[in-house]
Regions:
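Anionic-ligand binding patches
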Residues: 2-12, 16-200
């Protein structure tokens, strides 16, 4: 059993929003680092599922740094768009992962499919896959799914990514309006983390 105190773990992402959320979920005795601390860029994500892409990142950064790595792959699926964007969610923001651009594209696409979409309940879900690599002989993985709907407009400036347009099931606020404490009670990433925190 490794000594947990002052143990380094690398969060396998170059997305500042993800790094912050995962850091806040991890036990406080870890020293948290990121690929930027090692001058590493993200690997090519060519998996066809969230779990596969999460594993690709966790394995890559763990091998490169010789450290334990926890990596996230997540995305938004929208029923009306045939579950797009799914694993390609971040790519809708272009090379710079501009989520303002991505959100604009979501609304444009919804209007193209159904010009009256704002009068309907557009079902969607956030999915998060987490992988811990380098802690055990085999990777540790989990999946968190939160159902909800797409808001009629962008609301809130908290969180990151698609948070301002996603309203979780049985709630009235978007993730972009929620405090971090409230979001973690309804969040796909926190849900996935709960399944693997016992290993940490």
């Amino acid at each position: 059993m490794f000594k947990k105190k002052n143990k380094e773990i690398i969060v396998g992402s170059n997305n500042d929003g993800k790094i912050k959320e995962i850091k806040d979920l991890l036990p406080k005795y870890y020293i948290i680092t990121s690929p930027k601390d090692y001058g590493l860029k993200s690997p090519k994500e060519n998996g066809d599922t969230f779990l596969k892409n999460s594993l690709i990142k966790a394995k890559y950064f763990s091998k490169k740094t010789k450290k334990i790595c926890i990596a996230d792959d997540s995305g938004l699926e929208i029923d009306l768009l045939n579950n797009q964007h799914g694993i390609y969610s971040a790519r809708w923001g272009g090379n710079k992962s501009d989520f303002n651009l991505a959100i604009s594209r979501v609304y444009k696409k919804l209007s193209q499919v159904d010009k009256n979409w704002k009068s309907k309940n557009i079902k969607a879900r956030f999915i998060c896959a987490l992988t811990i690599y380098g802690l055990k002989k085999k990777p540790i993985q989990s999946l968190g799914i939160i159902n909800g709907r797409i808001s009629k407009k962008k609301i809130g400036n908290k969180g990151f990514g698609y948070d301002p347009i996603f309203i979780p099931e049985n709630k009235k606020l978007t993730f972009g309006q929620m405090s971090q404490k409230l979001k973690f009670k309804n969040d796909h990433r926190a849900k996935a983390f709960k399944k693997i925190k016992k290993f940490l």
